[in-house]
Regions:
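Solvent-exposed, flexible loop/coil segments flanking beta-strands in beta-rich domains
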Residues: 1-24
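Terminal beta-strand-rich extracellular "head" domains
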Residues: 29-87, 95-122
Length: 122
């Protein structure tokens, strides 16, 4: 799919692009990562991020695919967020952003090209 707006949104504007965690005891950090393949052209860029309980604000470190001049660049990047120990239910949302409004970024979303995951010690 393509996206051409300078607004952070949930990936593909689809509510299902989320990962839910439930913690009953505040002992472990939750390491989340979001990996995605994207294509940008003509001095455009794309950003992916993780939003903890948000579809419009990023948490942690975002990842960028930036094409500095004309041409095309295709790359897989990974965003990270380390969530501190806490109790309750949290949603970690995959987010996307187009750096230069009006120019399209192509995001790919099959299981081979997009993965949102969480890890913690057991």
């Amino acid at each position: 799919w393509t996206y051409s707006t300078e607004v952070l949104r949930q990936s593909r504007a689809t509510a299902g692009n989320t990962l839910m965690t439930l913690c009953g005891l505040a002992e472990e950090y939750i390491d989340t990562s979001f990996t995605q393949y994207s294509k940008v052209v003509n001095a455009n860029g794309s950003v992916i991020a993780i939003g903890k309980n948000s579809t419009t604000l990023q948490s942690g470190q975002f990842a960028r695919n930036q094409q500095p001049t004309s041409g095309q660049q295709e790359i897989t990047v990974t965003a990270f967020y380390k969530d501190p120990p806490g109790v309750g239910i949290n949603n970690f949302n995959s987010l996307e952003y187009c750096v230069t409004g009006g120019l399209s970024t192509t995001f790919y979303g099959t299981e081979n090209e997009m993965c949102l995951r969480a890890e913690w010690a057991a």
